[in-house]
Amino acid sequence: MAAVTQRISNYLSGVSKQADTKKYPGQVKECINGLPDVTLGMTKRPGFKFISKLKTTGGTDFTGTQLDNAKWFYINRDVTTRYIGCITPYANSANGNIYVWNADTGAACTITYAGTAQNYLSGTSHTNYDVNTVQDVSIITNDSQVITAQPEPTDFVAQSRGTLLLSGKIEQMQGYTFSVTVAGQTTASYTAAANADFDEILNTIETNINALGISGLTVTKHGTSLQLDRVVSSTRTPFTLAASGGDDKERFVVFQDWADNESWLPPNSFHNHVVTIVNSRLYDEDNYYAKFKADNSAAGSGYWIETIGPNKSPGLTKAKMPHRLRNTGTNTFTFEEIPWGDRIVGDDLTNSHPSFLGKTIKKTFFHDDRLGFLSEDNVILSRAKNPYELYAVSARTHTAGDPIDVNCASVRPTKLHAIKPARQGLILFSKNQQFIIYADDGPLTPQSTKIRPVSNMEMSDTVDPIDIGTHFNFISKTPNFVRVFAMQPKGLGESPEILDIGRVVNEWITVDVDTLVASIQNEFIAMSSQSSKDIYFYRTYSDGKETLMESWFKWSLPGTVQSMALDQDDMYCVTKQGNQYTLANANLTQSPEVAIITNALGQKINPCMDLYAQATSVTYDAVNDLSKCYIPYAHLADKKNIVIVAGTTAAGTFNNSGYTVNAEADAGGTYFIVNGQNLSTVASNVYVGYAFDFDLQLPQLYYNLAKEGSQHDYTSNLTIARCKFDVGLSGVMGFKLNVTGRFAATKSYKMFKNNCRDANGVEVYTDYEWSEADLKYIDRNQVKAKINNKLITDFTFQSDTKIRLGNSLLKQTTLSGNGTDTLFAYTFDVQSTDNIKVKIDGIETTDFVFAGGNFISFNTAPPNAANNIFIYNEDDLVIYIDEWYFLEPISDANTYLADDVPLDESRTVTIPIHQRSENFNLRIFTDSPFPVSLNSMMWEGNYSPRFYKRT
């Protein structure tokens, strides 16, 4: 056998669920709480710094399920003003609430609800809400609210008003006859005097109309016109109107609700007089409405402006439209209706409502100085530079700045749920199809906007896709797991490139994922679920030509992840531990600007521990020689408690900086106990928190025939002597080894023979007990069991030294003899009858033979008695400790500075193994609060190709 060595250059390729024979060098079976970095190697993730428990403005902790199923959002005003908030669901006949906390201090913000704005928060799930933040305003959309229009005016009655306008020169009227017919009654003929003026003619006609005595009719003179209104018993009443006069019988312009053109409009009228201008009687599309604005806001001279139809809804119901959460000051917000602009011109044909009327709005977005909306298969954008204006400014002309309302026009049922900007336009996402909205000649306008489909991928409609800079990522859910895809748009005439980036971890990501976020700066995406402690990451690195790193890994946090947000190198998380909600953040750099510990070389670190925070107080108990370090949150009983002393030795002053101890908690869970130390003298430097595991499970090692490591020689004989790891800035390195067939401790039993007895001395065939000396373990998860060398899981602990098997594992039959029959059947199946035993009246007997099938025949008939025959299979039961052995790495001789922080910038550690490669599993495992940085590994061993040459 040849003595060989090979190198694995790095462990940056992350998790792969492929067989070990197909894994590339650098891929691993599992990576928990790691963070791959092309510069630093595979590092232990940063710890999360405790900011605050989430409280109300009154200082009361949120507990239990108060914030469950909430919609979380993040607001970044500037570098120093950041907030994290949530919207709770409608429950117990009460609307939801908005809660916001300062992301840097944890202070609860004051939320003011303007008017009845809180009624908008009627969503029953976090999936009902969308939050779109720009500067100091967050637009909140509830997709359970159906959009309605304001009611149409009821005071308009057609033909209940009329106008008589004298037109032309006075000479065309002097000496000519005038008459008016109102409601079927005609006035007496009137001939204007040769020297009559406009006033005289109108005054006389007004007198003649009044003489008709028509009920409810009022005549008012305005300049050169008469205005007629009819109101009977407070109700506007229609009437007919006609008139003739002048040299051609047409010196009276007569109209009621509409006029043929603008020239018919009188220069004097009453304030808010509305007339329809009918440019063409064949088409309604060119109609518009004019309203008179009197100079004195009453009647007389003034001007005409374009207006809305007198019987048309003025716009949308603001209470049903998206609302806004406005940041009005430090830690203060107001939730209010948005001042949506009303429709001020046109009607439902010439200036229609947005297409989301009668439907719901799924999402809002900003693009090119417009506010956009997604509603079913429609995309609606506001007027340019007027985000709250959803109607055209004029019904007479169309401009490029008018609102845009377009439909996807797909043959598939489509409900748009997300939108992302791309170089070519905007990418629209629905569950089964994706589209692009664009314009050929620049910005989107009502005339130039187009939509066309670009792909037909199936995706989740409850988790929005994310923009990672050069491409988009989205997920697709199956009944049992999640697939992750990358989409890179191409040119307008090309389909996007779509890659299944999650194929290598197929069935690894759980189906309950409800949050997907991205860090463009750090080139990763992250997925989490409100019901899980795990966050799944996918990180890449490209040099501009090719992708040099693709890595899947997972973090496990100290509680279920309710929310996470990424802001440059900071990651904020809200987690739920039991009944408490905590806000924490982690800095993703290994050398943060503000560090807790600095060694003599100036290297800065924050501890790799979760919920680390300054102890709220530190007291020393001189009698018992111990320090009490009080914690600022409810104690987590399932975590390892850590106390660490902060400080710096960079100035040459050596103190307790970096001192670390695994502390016990008091019975009430209010403080950690450090024995033998008086930490009250350095109370401001005492930090408390919880350890978390860095766990890198390495695949089986193979001799690689190809330089790039893609050709595993899995038929050879390879014995690994040792592994040598090159590590960067690291504290304690830990390793675990599991060897096939080697158990830390075992206890063997014959079932139905070595079992326990109850208080009355009766055998309990399901219970098996051992002594602590036989099986000593730390965690019950280490205890395993096998029956006939087959692993079983159907057992429960009755105590620390006793388990109870499930009844289904027992092969037994109880029968009754009658003193005559000798042939009996047992009801279980076995491969061999060698271990079948029989007891009669509790005494084992061999006075029988196997009669074929599942029958036995007694030589002497068993006596007549109930349940006196017991047939069973005496299986072999083994209870054992399946333990990973902790290996102590061997370090080369070196020097270190006494009393300094225990950090090495670079070293090599050796792990002795001396096992065949298929006989062991190796894990890099540590829960130390100090960093870990793994660069590469070289293994040494003996390789034999088994007498065959590889070609």
Provide a role label for each language-model segment.
Residues M1-G106, L265-K363, H367-K415, P479-P496, ...:
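N-terminal beta-propeller domains
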Residues R7-Q27, P36-T39, T43-G47, G58, ...:
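Beta-sheet repeat architectures centered on beta-propellers
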Residues Q66-D68, Y113-N132, W340-K362, C408-A418, ...:
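Short linear interaction motifs
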Residues D68-F73, T81-N142, T163-D247, E262-P266, ...:
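Extended, beta-strand-rich, solvent-exposed assembly scaffolds of outer structural proteins
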Residues I84-T88, I140, G372-F373, L426-F429, ...:
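Conserved beta-strand element within WD40/beta-propeller blades
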Residues A108, W258, W264, F270, ...:
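Tryptophan-centered short beta-strand motifs
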Residues Q150-S160, D441-S460, F692-H712:
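A short, polar beta-strand/turn micro-motif
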Residues W340-D368, S375-G425, F429-N522, Q530-S532, ...:
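Beta-propeller and closely related beta-pinwheel folds
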